[in-house]
Amino acid sequence: MLRGIEIRGKVDKNVKSILTEECLTFLGELERRFGGIRKNLLQKRLDRQIDINNGILPSFLKDSDCKRATDKNWKCSSVPLEIQDRRVEITGPTDRKMVINALNSGAKVFMADFEDANCPNWENSIHGQQNMIDANNRTISFTSAEGRKYELNKQVAVLFVRPRGWHLNEDHLAIDGLSMSGSLFDFGCYIFHNHQILKNRNSNPYFYLPKMESHLEARLWNDVFVFSQNYLGMPIGTIKATVLIETILASFEMDEILYELRDHSAGLNCGRWDYIFSFIKKFQSYPDKMLPDRAKVTMTSPFMDSYVKLLIYTCHKRGVHAMGGMAAQIPIKNNEQANNAAMEKVRLDKQREVRAGHDGTWVAHPALIPIAMEQFNTHMKSQNQISYIPSSTAPNFEEIAKSLLSVDPVKPGDITEDGFRSNIVVGILYLEAWLNGNGCVPIHNLMEDAATAEISRSQIWQWIKHKAPLPDGKSFVTLQYYNRIFKEESDKLEKAHPNSKTLTDAIQIFNNLIVSPNFIDFLTPSCYKFVVDSERKTFSPKL
């Protein structure tokens, strides 16, 4: 093995085909050049959280070292023709059958997800990379246990890839004794193996970038792009990336984020569910910023509506796509009335997005594509509506800052026992699926990823901390209230799924997240440790 590079996962023919000596050398370069900067930025996140807990609220940057809204002259570089029209995009994990179905779905773009819709066990990570290579080579196929064969159509969606966020490690690969960045691993493997394939097809590498909290984190991605393009002999600007604005802090730095990535930008996306989670997390210490039941927080909530409007204005001012958020509904079988109601919600949501000025939107299931497509085809006659700027004058940023942070105080009835129980059940069920290797899970007729579990557990933690009012107006959410309902719901789940170790582990992880005196930033690292420890019991690492 190369000096200082250690594979800590099982080494088989699949691993060897991805982690070649040349690829490992490239990954080592990425980690050694950028890993330290990443860790410094993660420390800045912790420092920022302390400031917020101490009363220093987020605001727009007054003295940023990159041009902001006050400079109207710059625009991001143009994107290739094949991604000018992104009116409907489908997202999903990187397993072989899902990749084929998504590429064949009729959507304009498929975002293959190594992040929230993926459990990054070693097999998923390696097989996912191979599936990307085969997809770009147009050779990917799959035969089910029943003998059904899946192959690509002649016309397929454009492929985007979402690597893991900056906060996640790849524990199966160590550089100089330390786990590599999950972001750099996912990105590095993909760009190394696919850049030439894409060039040969007159296409480009496209990415979605998650979970950023500042323009400095966008600057790091840009530096990674520039280095990688130089290393691999690609012209600067070949890589294009859409940033998910899914943290409250990033919403105050959208202009700066676009500026940092201006040669590589393919716009911004409203990552609505993680945005809600981020709002709860960042304002964990603020009783006046608690949110009601998860189901009651919608895109028409004033703080969410302000975020959407600012994103569209900022993107179009800078000449890039403003992408709408996820519709997580899935078809409801054997209940036509419920299914029709669910599909009508999707229709209205997509109509709202396109009328607001979005250039495209996300769906989680192929059945939603015609519904979303109809709304965008009806209300957006051109490839996009980037030329539409919602206001002819610059917005009042002082007022926007207030609206981004403003929520109505929680009152009796906003938090219900049904909503409380739902958070517990959904959180545990998602964690159990994740521990079993599935990051994208159908629960209660919605396709859920990690964001839903994050909202569920963070709401409960915050409600307990601030003794949120219950519907009777006399009692409040307490640890004792949680313990009672948690025991009832976990007992039901264990009775329905006896002798399930992963369910027992999921219940333990969920409870640990709730009873921790300090808010735990992300739930996936806790789960990841279980996964890695379980894997290491079955093999001896190859050094």
UniProtKB/Swiss-Prot annotation:
GO cellular component, one term: cytoplasm
UniProt GO BP: glyoxylate cycle; tricarboxylic acid cycle
Pathway stated in the Swiss-Prot or TrEMBL entry: Carbohydrate metabolism; glyoxylate cycle; (S)-malate from isocitrate: step 2/2
Residue ranges of coiled coil: none
Keyword check for Transferase: yes
GO terms for MF: malate synthase activity
This enzyme's EC code(s): 2.3.3.9
Keywords: Glyoxylate bypass, Transferase, Tricarboxylic acid cycle
Active-site residue numbers: R162, D449
Catalytic activity, reaction form: glyoxylate + acetyl-CoA + H2O = (S)-malate + CoA + H(+)
Top-level taxon: Eukaryota
Pfam families: MS_C, MS_N, MS_TIM-barrel
Family membership: Belongs to the malate synthase family.
Protein name, as recorded: Malate synthase
Organism, as annotated: Dictyostelium discoideum
